[in-house]
Amino acid sequence: MEVLMAERTNLVFHNKVIDGTAIKRLISRLIDHFGMAYTSHILDQVKALGLRRATATSISLGIDDLLTIPSKRWLVQDAEQQSFLLEKNHHYGNVHVVEKLRQSIEVWYATSEYLRQEMNPNFQMTDPSNPVHLMSFSGARGNASQVHQLVGMRGLMSDPQGQMIDLPIQSNLREGLSVTEYIISCYGARKGVVDTAVRTSDAGYLTRRLVEVVQHILVRRTDCGTIRGISVSPQNGMTEKIFVQTLIGRVLADDIYIGLRCIGTRNKDIGIGLVNRFITFQAHPIYIRTPFTCRSTSWICQLCYGRSPTHGDLVELGEAVGIIAGQSIGEPGTQLTLRTFHTGGVFTGGTAEHVRAPSNGKIKFDEGLVHPTRTRHGHPAFLCFIDFYVTIESRDIRHNVNIPTKSLILVQNDQYVESEQVIAEIRAETSTFHFKERVQKHIYSESEGEMHWSTDGYHTPKYPYSNVHLLPKTSHLWILAGGLCRSNSNIVSFSLHKDQDQMNANSFSLKDLFDLSLTNDQVRHKLLDTFGKKDRESLDYSKPYRIISKGHWNLIEPSTYIRQENSLAKKRRNRFVIPLQYDQEQENKLIPCFGISIKIPINGILRRNSIIAYFDDPRYRRSSSGITKYGIVEVDSIVKKEDLIEYRGAKDFSPKYQTQMKVDQFFFIPEEIHILPGSSPIMVRNNSIIGVDTRLVLNINTRSRVGGLVRVERKKKSLELKIFSGDIHFYGEVDKISRHSGILIPPGIGKKDSKGSKKLKNWIYVQRITPTKKKYFVLVRPVVTYEIADGINLATLFSQDLLQEKNNVQLRIVNYILYENGKSIRGISHTSIQLVRACLVLTWDQEKKSSIEEKVHASFVEIRTNDLLCYFIRIELVKSTLSYTEKRYDTAGSGLISNNELDRIHRKNPFDSKAKIQIFPQHQGTLGTLLNRNKECQSFLILSSSNCSRIGPFNTSRYNNATKELDPMTPIRYLLGPLGTIVPRIVNSRSSYYLRTYNQVFLKKSFLLENFQQTFQVLQVPPFQYCFLDENSRIYNPDPCSNIIWNSFHLNWCFLHHDSCEEAWPIISLGQFLCENVYLLKYGSRIKKSGQIFIVHVDSLVIRSAKPYLVTPGATVHGHYGETFYEGDTLITFIYEKSRSGDITQGLPKVEQILEVRSIDSISMNLERRVEGWDERIRRILGIPWGFLIGAELTIAQSRISLVNKIQKVYRSQGVQIHNRHLEIIVRQVTSRVLVSEDGMSNVFLPGEFIGLLRAERAGRVLAESICYRAILLGITKSSLNTQSFISEASFQETARVLAKAALRGRIDWLKGLKENVVLGGIIPVGTGFNKLVHRSKQDKNIHLKIKRKNLFELEMSDILLHHRELFCSCAQELSMRHQTNLLRNVS
């Protein structure tokens, strides 16, 4: 008794909470010290103790135990405020959609997590023995996430697709949910229940398949005699923890030496002591035996398996290690699927944690330990590289808050902070994110409107002539409000253009263009509201040609129309001068003509491959809706491969004499489309067949123009009714009809089977229609074929160059299909559709080794010589450095202005003006500003800015009168001077009346100067050439300007007369985009709605409302500049990386994919080339036979290791520890099959037969002839159906097929596995039934000795291969001959 008491006094009492991990450690230590029997006795006592205590405690849960956290209300308010600001920023266009989504997730997730962290301290302070508090960390019947949903907030939920729903559930289950929150909650809960059911069944089925593959793997021998092993080293990126887990329980494959001292011998099992010795001495690499290296075919030896997972000794003979391995991998999946159910679909992701201030006070920290930076959302912060403390000083107390390494401090030193304010952000652990996937986020148009963007866009490299654009830098994309007219019943019967309207001339027939019977009074009476004020001057409509509209209207960028197709150009080395001719007779003949549209940006800068002009050919114009088809056209299988038609886009060719025309085709499949309101009562059924002139809608007299098949599709707010014309064919089951959406069949094709079939004369489009699941028929639709002439002889554009200089600047013609392949095009209110546009593309030879970006300046020049007015386009190649330097020039009595600036001035509206300019070819000159003879010019102003440069003579009465005479449709007001500006986005043409706006500007001061010989300063950007203006010539600018010079986007400088006081006003340019909430004036009010400046009055602006979208580089824009979009159309596609949740519900399918050997990763494009390079190098080093052998061995070994690592990655992300040897047994079975190839026909195996790898190697050694086979990866299902036991296969899947095949082949089942013995009722060969199999005969012993001799031979071979390569060839032959003679002696 005394001895017992003495022992008890020496015992240590541990007062700690014990969890599952601690229980595992305790059990393993008990087994090590006391053995299995005594340990089971102790565990029974622990179980009985727990049962008694739980019964005595009898914890129950009542509704009063659910105590809500008091800080929840203001935490939710804080998160709502941040979400509101985020929504505002997104609405203003400051934050794009992906950024908004990520920040919203972070805000609510951080709030929810902080509430969860506050939960336990709150319970400990108020009610430590609360049942909810006790259950929350028990791990048996509840977890923190469940209790958090009960008393905290449910937070963010996942939708059925697994995506996060943006609207969080702010209530908890104790408070009760609102209707909206309940519906969102049902999404997640349903997803949780379904996931649990599906994933549990998936995990169970996975376990069954795994056990099926390896049920016959037993430990049958002590040692298989292998000399192979795999190397384990911490240098291969393996952490020390994983290194230790990999080594413990294994057996060494080779001796381990440190210098001359051996610290580990071959075939010794590795314990924790030996691992510590390896780490201390840094012994690496360490070669260990694994199931991969075992020489057995259908079993495994004791030493290759290692220690038993239950107790510390080597595994016993007769252990069913295969079943243990299958269950070890499948069981964690079965258990962990319940995690989804526990959280009920609540979104759980990893974001940065926040540190909050414990009380009000002033924060202080050492500024020398932090460095200024920005958060990932762009907010200023301080980064700390070491752990340190920040101090918060309040009146009575000081708080020290620990800030971990690499955290971001979000407040400044000495700043006053409030209690629970976020002061720091701890970086999220990157190790939690194992899987990243690229996700596409589509942005859809919220309203109907016209697209504009504020930067250069370029085509994607894959589709250079499509409507998909990429933006090179962050910019805004605008949707200007307004849509196209769908009904022409209320439109006036002639084309009356209002200010800045874009009217489609093709929507009216020529006879409706004008009506001479209408008087001005009738027009004014009809359209009084359109012009706003009654006192506005009525326009003169008496001349009919003023009303005739342009032939086409599609304006893409700021452009100026030239309605003449005849262009001649003289070409110089770095410059074009293209004279433009205007045919006045055409205007008098009242014929609307189609012409070339010149397209030059506002700043006049063109880059390489810019489009400078385009021409809409009327041949490619359609009046009906339809579908375009081009690219690689799908043709039915009855056509040979050579008949595939590929649209190759435009051919690049130099502008020499090009006589050959290359013709490409594209196809247009016409169809009739009606867009009807969503509530329209339609009178035809879906998939019905109607005739011509059938009434479609009950209350509207809409009739079909063609007969055919009707397809009705319901959109968001409308019905889309399509009518397909064509023939309908019903086919039997014999004919195979492709299930694709449609197939084009070329002419000259007929069916080979049917005798009476005729060959096709034209292209047809075959479409499969399936009205019900069982029935289908085929619709054969007519196709309109268009041919694109891809070459135009550009030599006709230029005259012969006498100097024969090198052609640097070049023009080429590109045919541009305006609609993407397979796109459904719908015409609106009888408008015509332009399918192909011919574009004139400017290009030049880029200088090599030049970091300077080359640009081209394009400008319009107007020259009058001897009363002859000529217009030119001047295109000049200029090298411009990336950063401009500013210089000022002071010259007495003159102001310098560059030739380029002058060209840009006159580019504004050259065809409207009748001004005279004489340009003299001098490199540098002055701009004289003498008074006119009648001294009417009162002030002169020069402005220069990034986007505009204007010269304005104010109050020049002669100019005003002349303009009034020339254009009676332009009313001029005489306040202080007109600003008749052509809107940058809307361009005028001569055939319609001039699109002018009336921008009246008031000046605070007017400068009356008698002498103009004063100094002017001009901000100039070199290098440019200067032009000289004669002092006596008349200076004219169609865009007289005011002194409005400053805005919030561009900084423009104004250089006034030196006597005047310099004041700055905001510049308001027409077409300028303004974001909401921006101050336009210093003391004015904010802009209440985003939009584009439409009209500028004296005291007001008219803004066309627009919606801005922020677009980041790499985002894809769908559609052309200026294209009209409808509500719900796809505008932008963002591509961003999203961290996949590490939940096992996402991991299990990945494990299954790996084990079933399905492709999960994208394959490298140059994989084949790399493999060929590897083969060539290894053959060169080792010779042909050894190169192939070692290459094949390495491939199999590496693929096995890779598969094990991928599966471990999934399980480790969940904190599940599975020993590698279990995975290795499974992977060994997946990779142990080879496919007999047809290269060498052997008598033993059939070509295409699956055999074991070791069996194939042994058969090759025994037979005189070689067997050709290919290593192959078989999934676990296929491996289960390719075993040596047909009883096992038949009991798994495809029973009848397997048994019939086995009977035909006469297979014999040797009943070596567990399953076949269970099926037949025999004793299974494991455990006590194992000894029945093991009784060695003499013959068996002889085989064993032979194998050992062979092993020694292989060992010598490997030494020679690695150390004495030169001796190898001679020694190998000699050794093999000796070995053969020894065998012959034994046989004889």
UniProtKB/Swiss-Prot annotation:
MF-aspect GO terms: DNA binding; DNA-directed RNA polymerase activity; zinc ion binding
Q: Which InterPro entries match?
A: DNA-dir_RpoC2_beta_pp, RNA_pol_beta''_euk, RNA_pol_Rpb1_3_sf, RNA_pol_Rpb1_4, RNA_pol_Rpb1_5, Rpb1_funnel_sf
Which BP terms in the Gene Ontology apply to this protein? DNA-templated transcription
Required co-factor(s) are:
Zn(2+)
Pfam families, A to Z: RNA_pol_Rpb1_4 (PF05000), RNA_pol_Rpb1_5 (PF04998)
Q: Where is it localised?
A: Plastid, Chloroplast
Task: Tell me which EC number(s) this protein carries.
Answer: 2.7.7.6
Per UniProt, the keywords (alphabetical) are: Chloroplast, DNA-directed RNA polymerase, Metal-binding, Nucleotidyltransferase, Plastid, Transcription, Transferase, Zinc
What detail does the entry give on cofactor binding?
Binds 1 Zn(2+) ion per subunit.
Query: Which reaction equation describes what this protein catalyses?
Result: RNA(n) + a ribonucleoside 5'-triphosphate = RNA(n+1) + diphosphate
GO CC annotations on file: chloroplast; DNA-directed RNA polymerase complex; mitochondrion
Where is Zn(2+) annotated to bind? Answer: C224, C294, C301, C304
Quaternary structure and partners: In plastids the minimal PEP RNA polymerase catalytic core is composed of four subunits: alpha, beta, beta', and beta''. When a (nuclear-encoded) sigma factor is associated with the core the holoenzyme is formed, which can initiate transcription.
Family in the record: Belongs to the RNA polymerase beta' chain family. RpoC2 subfamily.
Q: What does this protein do?
A: DNA-dependent RNA polymerase catalyzes the transcription of DNA into RNA using the four ribonucleoside triphosphates as substrates.
Protein name (record): DNA-directed RNA polymerase subunit beta''
